[in-house]
């Protein structure tokens, strides 16, 4: 283990050096590099898809859970979408060197706050091979290095993708060490201890996996442990519209962290709404678990207290009837994970109250929670979703992968001039 730690430390040092080199590239050069990566990924698509097929076959033999298999599976459409995300990202403005503050403290004493890279990202994820493409492209665009560790079930897919990225980096005379792939659990544990060389850990995976990462590192962690999302159907909801939203939010990709896990229905509209939505969900193979009030309207399995706290990541949906908007908000703030929650209503005041009082990273009105995604927000891609209160919060794109530094330029000014009885006043004039 000691030898492994030393070897990984050397690799992390190389990644940090590569990241510093990459950060010196112009925005146009990094844009060109991303375009080259997208082209190489397209050229290598048959090899990548074949590698993923091998991973899927091995996972099936081992009895992988359906939700994890859904994340693992990389078909041609999903790969094409990931590559399109790289091209979209390439066209976004350069996030580095942006002037956030430009202030004249005094004549000839200029303070600026400039954006700069975080440094080295340690990204650990389960199954999701397309995450490699998203994370590597975001890291390059933002001038960061990335050390990636995918789940063992996706090892062939990840190796094929990273090989294609490395090929593009080499062909463009970019530092290949900027993007590095780890393959063993032992390396994961060692990575979590490299606080001297890794600046941010980003875990993507199950609740237990993310909590394991949070509990085993001193490096700052960005991410979320749960994706318990809600849709509240208000008494003023439009039934047909809301049924469509509900079906999409649960079934469009049930393994996603932004799929709803609990459906809250105002008791005044439940007799009209619940039978219709239950039939639509049944057609999609969704199993319902409801409280006693819901069961009197539509036969379904009885829900327990644990169901309100469960991220199913599957075609299972908990259903609860509530007497008021206040009760729905209280339920969400008690049982939700702070990810994304939505209200369906034609009452603007109810929507405004929901927006104000639900304490989540994303609060929606009359639309599916599945929009909680960096690509759909126009970020080009996302490195993950954060439910923490401090920024970045929600889908994390480029802005979450840069920090800032204060740059002060003067001409011999000293602090003593501005202190004491004869202190010269500051101008503090924004330019």
Curated annotation (Swiss-Prot):
Q: Where in the cell is it found?
A: Cytoplasm
What is this enzyme's EC?
A: 1.2.1.41
Name the GO cellular-component terms: cytoplasm
Q: Which PROSITE patterns match?
A: PROA
Q: Which GO terms describe its molecular function?
A: glutamate-5-semialdehyde dehydrogenase activity; NADP binding
The residue ranges crossing the membrane are none
Q: Species lineage, top-down?
A: Bacteria, Bacillati, Cyanobacteriota, Cyanophyceae, Synechococcales
Q: What is this protein called?
A: Gamma-glutamyl phosphate reductase
- The scientific name of the source species is Synechococcus elongatus (strain ATCC 33912 / PCC 7942 / FACHB-805)
- Signal peptide residues on this chain, from the entry's feature table: none
Q: In which pathway does it act?
A: Amino-acid biosynthesis; L-proline biosynthesis; L-glutamate 5-semialdehyde from L-glutamate: step 2/2
Domain of life (superkingdom): Bacteria
Catalytic activity reads: L-glutamate 5-semialdehyde + phosphate + NADP(+) = L-glutamyl 5-phosphate + NADPH + H(+)
Statement: the UniProt record of this protein carries the keyword Isomerase: no
GO BP, one annotated term: L-proline biosynthetic process
| CDD domains reported for this sequence | ALDH_F18-19_ProA-GPR
Q: Which major enzyme category is it?
A: oxidoreductase
Task: Give the principal location in a single coarse category.
Answer: cytoplasm
Keywords from the UniProt entry: Amino-acid biosynthesis, Cytoplasm, NADP, Oxidoreductase, Proline biosynthesis
> What is the stated purpose of this protein?
Catalyzes the NADPH-dependent reduction of L-glutamate 5-phosphate into L-glutamate 5-semialdehyde and phosphate. The product spontaneously undergoes cyclization to form 1-pyrroline-5-carboxylate.
Family as reported in the entry's similarity comment: Belongs to the gamma-glutamyl phosphate reductase family.
């Amino acid at each position: 283990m000691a030898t492994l730690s030393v070897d990984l430390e050397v690799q992390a040092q190389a990644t940090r050096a590569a990241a510093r080199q990459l950060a010196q590239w112009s925005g146009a050069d990094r844009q060109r590099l991303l375009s080259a990566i997208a082209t190489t990924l397209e050229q290598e698509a048959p090899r990548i898809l074949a590698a993923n097929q091998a991973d899927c076959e091995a996972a099936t033999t081992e009895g992988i859970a359906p939700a994890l298999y859904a994340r693992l599976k990389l078909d041609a459409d999903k790969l094409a979408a990931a590559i399109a995300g790289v091209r979209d990202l390439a066209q976004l403005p350069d996030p580095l060197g942006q002037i956030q503050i430009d202030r004249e403290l005094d004549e000839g004493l200029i303070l600026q706050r400039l954006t700069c890279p975080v440094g080295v990202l340690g990204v650990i994820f389960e199954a999701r091979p397309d995450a490699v493409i998203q994370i590597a492209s975001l890291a390059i665009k933002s001038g960061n290095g990335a050390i990636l560790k995918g789940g063992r079930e996706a090892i062939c897919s990840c190796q094929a993708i990273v090989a294609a990225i490395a090929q593009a980096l080499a062909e463009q005379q970019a530092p290949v060490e900027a993007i590095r792939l780890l393959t063993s659990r032992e390396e994961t544990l060692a990575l979590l201890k490299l606080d001297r060389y890794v600046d941010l850990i980003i875990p993507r995976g199950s609740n237990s996996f993310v909590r394991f990462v949070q509990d085993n590192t001193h490096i700052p962690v960005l991410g979320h442990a749960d994706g318990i999302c809600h849709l509240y159907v208000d008494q003023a909801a439009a039934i047909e519209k809301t049924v469509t939203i509900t079906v999409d939010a649960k079934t469009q990709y049930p393994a996603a962290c932004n799929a709803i896990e609990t459906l809250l229905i105002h008791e005044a509209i439940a007799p009209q709404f619940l039978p219709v939505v239950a039939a639509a969900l049944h057609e999609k193979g969704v199993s319902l678990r409801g409280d006693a009030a819901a069961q009197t309207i539509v036969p379904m399995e009885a829900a327990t207290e644990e169901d309100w706290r469960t991220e199913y990541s599957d075609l299972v949906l908990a259903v609860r009837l509530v007497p008021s908007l206040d009760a729905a908000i209280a339920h969400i703030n008690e049982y939700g994970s702070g990810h994304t929650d939505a209200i369906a209503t034609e009452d603007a005041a109810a929507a405004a109250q929901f927006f104000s009082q639900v304490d989540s990273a994303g609060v929606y009105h009359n639309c599916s929670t599945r929009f909680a995604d960096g690509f759909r927000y126009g970020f080009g891609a996302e490195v993950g979703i954060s439910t923490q209160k401090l920024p970045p919060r929600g889908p994390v794109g480029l802005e979450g992968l840069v920090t800032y530094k204060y740059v002060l330029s003067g001409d011999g000014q000293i602090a003593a001039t501005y202190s004491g009885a004869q202190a010269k006043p500051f101008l503090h004039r924004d330019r």
